[in-house]
């Protein structure tokens, strides 16, 4: 799913106004897993220039780490790989792909669905003629296209959310895939704007009346 539109606004999470990634993370952390009705969704969050973070309960993280160790055949554990992901966005997308593969293997025994959230997708996967793209841009487009095209991923329980101001900003080899849907986040209406102003005034000891402070 590509979330477009008003993605850089602040959103009320029930307690405070927070960025969209934080809002989504809190909302999805309260949802039960559709298959188990007990374990929640494991969130994997990638924000540009930051390391990938995995959000879930201890059992979910341990399951994922255990499966990673079996599948990767590497002496480096998942935590070490995650720590390295903030240095290279191409590597980060490759790692997200591998984490989804591990999750599908893990789902044979326990349904720990993943929700992968990727910030600034239009910067990671920019719309441009392939011949004019940098090598790393081309690699990232190829990684995501292969990932989203895998039958096991399309038929599996994991989901990916891409954040971009517009769908057209994401490379067409990704954005035009039939399995990629778009949801536009609208601008706040008058009720939402009033709530924000009232909440801001309350936090800062101010009262707003008829547009005046």
Region spans (language model):
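ATP/nucleotide-binding catalytic cores
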Residues: 1-213
């Amino acid at each position: 799913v590509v979330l477009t539109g008003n993605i850089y606004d602040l959103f009320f999470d029930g307690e405070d106004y927070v960025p969209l990634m934080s809002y989504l993370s809190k909302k999805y952390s309260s949802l039960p897993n559709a298959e188990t009705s007990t374990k929640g969704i494991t969130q994997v969050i990638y924000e540009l220039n930051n390391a990938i973070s995995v959000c879930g309960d201890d059992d979910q993280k341990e399951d994922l780490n255990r499966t990673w160790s079996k599948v990767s055949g590497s002496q480096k554990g998942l935590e070490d790989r995650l720590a390295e992901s903030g240095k290279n966005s191409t590597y980060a997308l490759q790692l997200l792909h591998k984490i989804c593969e591990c999750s599908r293997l893990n789902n044979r025994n326990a349904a720990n669905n993943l929700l992968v959230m990727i910030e600034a997708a239009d910067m990671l996967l920019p719309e441009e003629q392939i011949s004019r793209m940098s090598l790393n841009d081309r690699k990232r487009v190829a990684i995501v296209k292969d990932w989203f095209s895998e039958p096991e991923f399309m038929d599996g329980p994991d989901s990916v959310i891409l954040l971009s101001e517009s769908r057209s900003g994401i490379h067409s080899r990704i954005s035009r895939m039939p399995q990629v849907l778009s949801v536009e986040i609208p601008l706040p209406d008058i009720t939402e704007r009033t709530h924000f102003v009232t909440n801001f005034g309350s936090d800062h000891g101010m009262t707003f009346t008829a547009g005046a402070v």
